[in-house]
Amino acid sequence: MAAEEGQVIGCHTNDVWTVQLDKAKESNKLIVIDFTASWCPPCRMIAPIFNDLAKKFMSSAIFFKVDVDELQSVAKEFGVEAMPTFVFIKAGEVVDKLVGANKEDLQAKIVKHTGVTTA
């Protein structure tokens, strides 16, 4: 279930999540996780922007989408309490978190942690 370059990797089972996260960690790229829910209007609003950012930063980051209702244990592991929540992982460690559907803040954090200002 690997995504093509520049695509968001949707994880719908714990097994897929574990395999894909391990692969992403091996890449040494920034990992950006969008914790979302199908019933969340701000999540639906930010989804196309998140997809665009995945294309823009494909050489320096890997993007995941996790539905909190499908993978409750993963959401709990990362302390997700509101949606959308974006978690940023670098070198296997959580380095940042953003709660809310703010396009500018999301892009700014990706730039900050990748060091890439333009794609």
Curated annotation (Swiss-Prot):
Keywords: Cytoplasm, Disulfide bond, Electron transport, Redox-active center, Transport
InterPro entries, per the entry: Thioredoxin (IPR005746), Thioredoxin-like_sf (IPR036249), Thioredoxin_CS (IPR017937), Thioredoxin_domain (IPR013766), Thioredoxin_H-type-like (IPR050620)
Domain Thioredoxin: 2-115
Record: active site: 40, 43
CDD domains cross-referenced by the UniProt entry: TRX_family (cd02947)
GO molecular function terms attached to this record: oxidoreductase activity, acting on a sulfur group of donors, disulfide as acceptor; protein-disulfide reductase activity
Pfam families given in the database record: Thioredoxin
Residues making up the signal peptide according to the UniProt record: none
Compartment(s) where it occurs, according to its Swiss-Prot or TrEMBL record: Cytoplasm
Disulphide-bonded residues: 40-43
GO cellular component: cytosol
NCBIfam families cross-referenced by the UniProt entry: thioredoxin
Description of how the protein assembles with itself and partners: Interacts with MDH1.
Record-stated family: Belongs to the thioredoxin family. Plant H-type subfamily.
Function summary: Thiol-disulfide oxidoreductase probably involved in the redox regulation of a number of cytosolic enzymes. Possesses insulin disulfide bonds reducing activity.
PANTHER family hit by this protein: THIOREDOXIN, THIOREDOXIN H4-RELATED
Designated name of the protein: Thioredoxin H4
